[in-house]
Amino acid sequence: MDVNPTLLFLKVPAQNAISTTFPYTGDPPYSHGTGTGYTMDTVSRTHQYSEKGKWTTNTETGAPQLNPIDGPLPEDNEPSGYAQTDCVLEAMAFLEESHPGIFENSCLETMEVVQQTRVDKLTQGRQTYDWTLNRNQPAATALANTIEVFRSNGLTANESGRLIDFLKDVMESMDKEEMEITTHFQRKRRVRDNMTKKMVTQRTIGKKKQRLNKRSYLIRALTLNTMTKDAERGKLKRRAIATPGMQIRGFVYFVETLARSICEKLEQSGLPVGGNEKKAKLANVVRKMMTNSQDTELSFTITGDNTKWNENQNPRMFLAMITYITRNQPEWFRNVLSIAPIMFSNKMARLGKGYMFESKSMKLRTQIPAEMLANIDLKYFNESTRKKIEKIRPLLIDGTASLSPGMMMGMFNMLSTVLGVSILNLGQKRYTKTTYWWDGLQSSDDFALIVNALNHEGIQAGVDRFYRTCKLVGINMSKKKSYINRTGTFEFTSFFYRYGFVANFSMELPSFGVSGINESADMSIGVTVIKNNMINNDLGPATAQMALQLFIKDYRYTYRCHRGDTQIQTRRSFELKKLWEQTRSKAGLLVSDGGPNLYNIRNLHIPEVCLKWELMDEDYQGRLCNPLNPFVSHKEIESVNNAVVMPAHGPARSMEYDAVATTHSWTPKRNRSILNTSQRGILEDEQMYQKCCNLFEKFFPSSSYRRPVGISSMVEAMVSRARIDARIDFESGRVKKEEFAEIMKICSTIEELRRQK
């Protein structure tokens, strides 16, 4: 039927029409090849913003370093990193004055965290720069490798399991004259295959010991590896992001804990909360400004954008902030927190894989690793690359570039938010001492500024003053990219405000559909996404019902599980028809087994298995929930799982969904091609690590799991736990005498083996 599109909007308030402007239908762009060029761009831009600073040389590593702090005063219109220490300190002092006790309380909270955090905190997170192998690894492996190397070099404080003790080892490692590490390498030899009689290349993985002198070790400890940020929409150019090594991570974690604690107490901070909580917090600030702007006052809002936030921030400023925030605290605490910014002032950016060269005439491809860029002849490069390399050559050491100014992306989000809020805080009338005043919202580098004044001239004066105050602490508001509107319409962190935050439902569109994990998880995630959007994003009942029907259709096409009585022919239809005919209660069949859909918008919160359980044939129940089914390799399934949901804009979010373990919750097997590469040794380490952790969890189920106190190894803990459990089971009659004796014997054998080792 033909619909006149204007009819759709007859009863819709204008702000709800935002969902029709959705630009992001296709896949987001991904990067290929090396990120070396993007990293060099970052390095040269960062130095350019601070070029009038003072040059010094790091005495330990020999790296040239540029310090723009307290240098020339910043200029209007030109982005720069010339922050002034006294201005930052004064902003901090005023922030404390308007929030009495805020720093003191946050320090106390953080001190508690510092003393309790275990080193396994560092296993969270994805790819991490592993300094022992000089490339990225999963966080858990990188940590295991670091600890292993520390212990073989006589650094053992980490054995207590506390993060703070691991950090003591990090500090000591930097004073050592040399560190011995184990690296993986590959040997290739040509051998004749017995079966096919062809020559094949056989790869063997070796481990070899290598000594790093103090300078090389320090360079690695201070290195941030760089990658290209993927899936960024709305940008023509890609950009580099950084991943720090294990030496830096722990220190950063504590600084961010302190900053998070401060942000939680600041009404202008958009971090660390999210979602509806964030919207409520922000709406409060707007309400305050609107109600306080009397009838005579004008109120305007700037949807703000800062030029190159990270590249103009400076770790030395963060050091000044921390020194001020912790000024009345114990010496050890101040030292722990000041190490992260000091390490960042001496950081090195790893340039990545290097450049790929192709010779069209000779059909040759070769890679120039980053290490060679310092002394290769530049005639092979095109104009723009040549300029880039020439510019950063003086900064190169061992394939890394010295990068003292600037913060790499995403490192100190919370602390930089505190800096931004401290400037917003200065907008109160008691500080501006004139008729205009301002307030606003800050979330990492994103901000919204609300200015009130008696007339347009006052608004202009207020904006100018805010702009210049920001300049003094290294924040550069972009005049080109920020725009001003009457208060009541603005955008902040992809939330659109028009007399209240507008639900932009279309942003969630990419997360509708079938995830492709397995039949069980996909059904659960699909209905949860619809449910969540009804709660949070104004997804109305009729639209939700339609979304649900489309989802079921999509799901049936994906898994080829059309209803048993359908005419559609697929690879599975023969089996599903047979099942349909054998089943007495057809309503009990899961959708993935050709059953009908029983979901509607009222019961989206119930997992499908539970929804249909009473309707199922008994033998079907038995097959469906059978942990011994040999065709299903089971993960042990928690009652709640996490799925990663991709909205169109902003970071991927984790979403909880209910997981009921059935024979549909299969896990695909790992691709085997990795087993023939140099990654293999690492993969084996990782599996070993995984097995140990799983075993440990079997002994200490989460309900009874108290973090181990005192120093005992995992093995000792498990043995003593096994003995206690066995005794309890024996005394209550759950375990026979012979079994009990056997358990005790095994425990003794394990201890004996440990002693011999």
Curated annotation (Swiss-Prot):
Chain segments carrying region Disordered: 49-70
Motif Nuclear localization signal: where in chain: 187-195, 203-216
Any single biological process term in GO: viral RNA genome replication
Pfam families linked: Flu_PB1
Subcellular location(s) of the protein: Host nucleus; Host cytoplasm
Polar residues bias locations: 55-64
E.C. code: 2.7.7.48
Entry comment on modification after translation: Phosphorylated by host PRKCA.
Start and end residues of each RdRp catalytic domain: 286-483
UniProt keyword Isomerase present: no
Region of interest (Promoter-binding site), ranges: 249-256
Keywords: Eukaryotic host gene expression shutoff by virus, Eukaryotic host transcription shutoff by virus, Host cytoplasm, Host gene expression shutoff by virus, Host nucleus, Host-virus interaction, Inhibition of host RNA polymerase II by virus, Nucleotide-binding, Nucleotidyltransferase, Phosphoprotein, RNA-directed RNA polymerase, Transferase, Viral RNA replication, Viral transcription
An example Gene Ontology molecular-function term: RNA binding
GO cellular component, one term: host cell cytoplasm
Family of the protein in this entry: Belongs to the influenza viruses polymerase PB1 family.
Oligomeric form and interacting partners: Influenza RNA polymerase is composed of three subunits: PB1, PB2 and PA. Interacts (via N-terminus) with PA (via C-terminus). Interacts (via C-terminus) with PB2 (via N-terminus); this interaction is essential for transcription initiation.
Reported function: RNA-dependent RNA polymerase which is responsible for replication and transcription of virus RNA segments. The transcription of viral mRNAs occurs by a unique mechanism called cap-snatching. 5' methylated caps of cellular mRNAs are cleaved after 10-13 nucleotides by PA. In turn, these short capped RNAs are used as primers by PB1 for transcription of viral mRNAs. During virus replication, PB1 initiates RNA synthesis and copy vRNA into complementary RNA (cRNA) which in turn serves as a template for the production of more vRNAs.
Name by which UniProt lists this protein: RNA-directed RNA polymerase catalytic subunit
Organism expressing this protein natively: Influenza A virus (strain A/Turkey/Ireland/1378/1983 H5N8)
Gene assigned in the entry: PB1
